[in-house]
């Protein structure tokens, strides 16, 4: 693993699990043939120790040690709360 910490931002799409939130992060990728930028969405399972996130919040999260088979990201900060 490299020394650089990967930080990402995304919108919380599910808070159904205990201490875990599902986050959708969007990125733009250039199509190899046509050159148009296409929006890609990736789903991340993020560890939320205090269950402080709500659905619709925009959060910042970082890569960390594996908490489970699918959960390898940890909550850093809540950027914007959904009303």
Curated annotation (Swiss-Prot):
The keyword Coiled coil does not apply. One of its GO terms (cellular component) is cytosolic small ribosomal subunit. It comes from the Bacteria. CDD domains: Ribosomal_uS17. Signal peptide: none annotated. Pfam families: Ribosomal_S17 (PF00366). GO terms for biological process: translation. InterPro entries: NA-bd_OB-fold, Ribosomal_uS17, Ribosomal_uS17_bact/chlr. Keywords: Ribonucleoprotein, Ribosomal protein, RNA-binding, rRNA-binding. One of its GO terms (molecular function) is structural constituent of ribosome. Part of the 30S ribosomal subunit. One of the primary rRNA binding proteins, it binds specifically to the 5'-end of 16S ribosomal RNA. PANTHER family: 40S RIBOSOMAL PROTEIN S11 FAMILY MEMBER, SMALL RIBOSOMAL SUBUNIT PROTEIN US17M. Belongs to the universal ribosomal protein uS17 family. This is Small ribosomal subunit protein uS17. It comes from Francisella tularensis subsp. tularensis (strain SCHU S4 / Schu 4). The gene is rpsQ.
């Amino acid at each position: 693993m490299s020394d650089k910490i990967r930080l990402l931002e995304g919108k919380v799409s599910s808070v159904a699990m205990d201490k875990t939130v599902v986050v959708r992060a969007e990125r733009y990728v250039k199509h190899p043939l046509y050159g148009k930028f296409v929006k890609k969405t990736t789903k991340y399972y993020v560890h939320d120790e205090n269950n402080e996130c709500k659905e619709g919040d925009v959060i910042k999260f970082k890569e960390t040690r594996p908490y489970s088979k699918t959960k390898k990201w940890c909550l850093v900060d809540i950027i914007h709360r959904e009303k």
